[in-house]
Design a protein with these regions (language model features):
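Short, surface-exposed basic-aromatic patches at helix termini and helix-loop junctions that form
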Residues: 55-58, 123-131, 154-155
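Structured core elements
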Residues: 41, 65, 110-112, 139, ...
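DnaQ-like (DEDDh/DEDDy) 3′-5′ exonuclease domain used for proofreading
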Residues: 1-65, 72-86, 91-94
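Short, flexible loop/turn elements at secondary-structure junctions
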Residues: 46-48, 70, 115-117, 142-144, ...
Length: 197
């Protein structure tokens, strides 16, 4: 399997491994609702939070949705979104490794990204999860109308990369029904008088 190398990769991986594990502590002042619920909001650095989840949830999470910084060049309150590619990769790699460790054998991870870091994200996910565990690239149109203020070609599409933990992972498909069959739509249009056949 090919490996993506960048400046600072080994240092970033070593630094992430050196981050100590912390136990999660409930803050009653910030708590709301049923104290026995399994739902939680974790405030803090996501690397430390992921490490804190491992003792409780390693190998048991069925679905992770990750929305990392897109590296757009914009400044956000909680993270810098204007990183060098190598810095961005060094940020993402150890977090993705921890997310992989949290996934159950039938688990999957769904990661939002745009074109700026899509190729790099795909390569490190192939390395971490395995090329054969790639499920799909879901492309979705985020903008439906062109703007006249664009300085170049407008990017209207974003991506969601989907990987499974193992190659044996099967999607939860809904059973096919007549309501989803293409012919039923044609029958609807015909009987509604919208089209004539």
């Amino acid at each position: 399997m090919p490996e993506l190398l960048w400046e600072g990769k080994s240092d970033a991986v070593a630094a992430a491994k050196a981050v100590p594990y912390h136990l999660l502590e409930a803050d009653d002042a910030l708590s709301y609702g049923d104290a026995n619920t399994e739902n939680m909001i974790i405030q803090g650095d996501n690397l430390a939070a992921l490490k804190a989840l491992l003792p409780y949830y390693k190998g048991s999470v069925r679905c992770i949705y990750a929305d990392p910084p897109y590296n757009t060049g914009s400044a956000f309150e909680h993270y810098d979104d204007n990183l060098e590619h190598s810095t961005w990769l060094s940020l993402m790699y150890p977090r993705l490794e921890l997310m992989r460790d949290l996934l159950s054998e039938d688990g999957s991870i769904w990661i939002s990204i745009d074109d700026r870091e899509y190729a790099n994200l795909k390569l490190i996910c192939d390395e971490i999860f395995g090329y054969d565990c790639f499920v799909s690239n879901i492309s979705w149109q985020r903008t439906y109308s062109a703007r006249n203020d664009s300085k170049g070609i407008m990017n209207e599409v974003e991506h969601i990369l989907v990987y499974s933990k193992t190659t044996t992972c099967q999607p939860n498909r809904l059973p096919r029904t007549s309501s989803v069959e293409p012919l039923s739509y044609i029958h609807y249009l015909t009987f509604s008088g919208i089209i004539g056949i």
